């Protein structure tokens, strides 16, 4: 925000994009507010610059619902010539036919992911993966994780979704991750481009990939796994 007029925060759903951006914003436009959604969409099509009025940085949440806001943000950034004007959050499923400018030089892109074990305060952070790959002399002798194997398996299954850490029991935490996968299979896989896809088949494909994580597998093996389910 100190360098660019706008920042786009990209990443999977539920990873905390809107919550994080809200802590930095001084005004917020929520495109999916049910009481104002239709009004916002009409305004976005007729005069999108009106929706950009507000204290800065102004957060535009779920901006992909009105893709023309992208070019409007770029135009306002050009006019104002002041860093830190807008934060955009939302899905990657965007109708790019309504976007005419890449935003280069005006809109910076940041990738956000679910929390690491360090961020969830479950890891000591003593071992750096970056150093392991980049520094051949990196010494990790004597550094031990405080987590048991069972705890690591649970954390990997639970994931780093902020909502799961708020759940009251371990079972509830796993339900958050399970619901995330179910939502992908039943809704997101079709909403990306509007084409209806089979939720059960999608689930079987994901299961086939999950069974073969960290292995080399032929496409035929994956197909056999799916068709035999």
Where are these regions (language model features)?
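Conserved lysine of the Walker
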Residues: 17-18
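Post-Walker A alpha-helix
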Residues: 21-22
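Short glycine-rich substrate-engagement loop in P-loop NTPases that contacts/grips substrate
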Residues: 28-57
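Structural recognition of the conserved hydrophobic beta-strand(s) that form the central parallel beta-sheet
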Residues: 59-60, 85-91, 111, 120
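Conserved catalytic/switch belt of AAA+ P-loop NTPases
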Residues: 70-94
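Short regulatory helix/loop adjacent to the ATP-binding pocket of P-loop NTPases
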Residues: 94-109, 121-126
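Interdomain hinge/linker elements that couple catalytic modules in large macromolecular machines
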Residues: 122-229
